[in-house]
C-alpha cells in the first residue's frame, strides 16, 4: 500500500503534444505547494538518458518516485506518454495500491493535432513529425476502463478544471 487516505494520485497520459505537461503544471499551480509532478520525460530522458524500451529502468523509477511522494503526503501527478503496453501494469498497481483517491486520464488527440501542437512548443526542434509518427499510438487506453478520456477539443483550461473538479483537489486555506 502507498500514500494515505488523504493523498490524491492523478495520472495524465496521452500522445506527444497532447498537453500532459501543461496540465500537470497547471494542476500544481492551482493547488500550490504539496503537489509532486512525476514527469516521465524528466526521469527517462534527463535522469537516466534511457530510450523508451520494454522493461526500461525508468518504469520502476517512476513508480518509486510516485510512491515516495505519496508516502510523504504529497498529492502526486504522474504524467507522460506512458504507453499502455509498457507502463500499464505499473500504473494499474500504483492506482490499486494507493490508499487515497486515484484518477487516471488519457488526453486523446489524433496524429495531425499532435503535430500541430508540437510545432508551437519550445522543444519543437528536438524531434520531427516523422519521429512522432514512430511512437504515436492512437487511443492507447489502459485495459479495464481505468481512465477517463479527455477529447482533443477540450481546452487546457477546461481539462484542468475538469480534473480539479473530479479529484476535489483544492488548495488548503492560506493565511494572508
Place the predicted regions along the sequence by residue.
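Hydrophobic anchor at the beta1->P-loop junction of P-loop NTPases
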Residues: 12
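P-loop (Walker A) phosphate-binding loop of NTP-binding proteins
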Residues: 15
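ATP-binding Walker
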Residues: 18
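Walker A/P-loop
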Residues: 21
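Conserved substrate/cofactor phosphate-moiety recognition/catalytic segment
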Residues: 25-71
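Glycine-rich phosphate-binding loop used to anchor ATP phosphates in small-molecule kinases
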Residues: 54-102
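Conserved phosphate-donor/acceptor-positioning beta-strand/loop module used by diverse small-molecule
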Residues: 98-117, 150
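Small-molecule kinase domains that catalyze NTP-dependent phosphoryl transfer to phosphate-bearing small molecules
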Residues: 120-176
Amino acid at each position: 500500500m502507498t500514500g494515505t487516505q488523504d493523498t490524491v494520485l492523478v495520472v495524465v497520459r496521452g500522445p506527444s503534444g497532447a498537453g500532459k505537461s501543461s496540465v500537470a503544471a497547471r494542476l500544481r499551480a492551482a493547488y500550490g505547494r504539496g503537489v509532486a509532478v512525476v514527469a516521465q520525460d524528466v526521469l527517462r530522458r534527463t535522469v537516466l538518458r534511457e530510450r523508451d524500451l520494454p522493461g526500461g529502468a525508468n518504469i520502476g523509477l517512476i513508480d518509486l518516485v510516485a510512491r515516495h511522494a505519496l508516502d510523504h503526503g504529497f498529492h502526486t501527478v504522474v504524467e507522460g506518454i506512458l504507453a499502455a503496453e509498457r507502463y500499464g501494469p505499473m500504473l494499474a498497481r500504483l492506482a490499486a495500491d494507493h490508499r487515497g483517491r486515484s484518477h487516471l486520464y488519457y488526453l486523446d488527440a489524433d496524429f495531425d493535432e499532435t503535430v500541430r501542437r508540437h510545432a508551437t512548443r519550445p522543444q519543437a526542434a528536438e524531434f520531427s513529425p516523422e519521429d512522432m509518427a514512430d511512437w504515436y499510438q492512437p487511443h492507447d487506453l489502459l485495459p479495464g476502463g481505468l481512465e477517463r478520456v479527455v477529447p482533443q477539443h477540450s481546452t487546457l483550461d477546461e481539462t484542468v478544471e475538469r480534473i480539479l473538479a473530479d479529484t476535489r483537489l483544492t488548495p488548503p486555506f492560506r493565511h494572508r
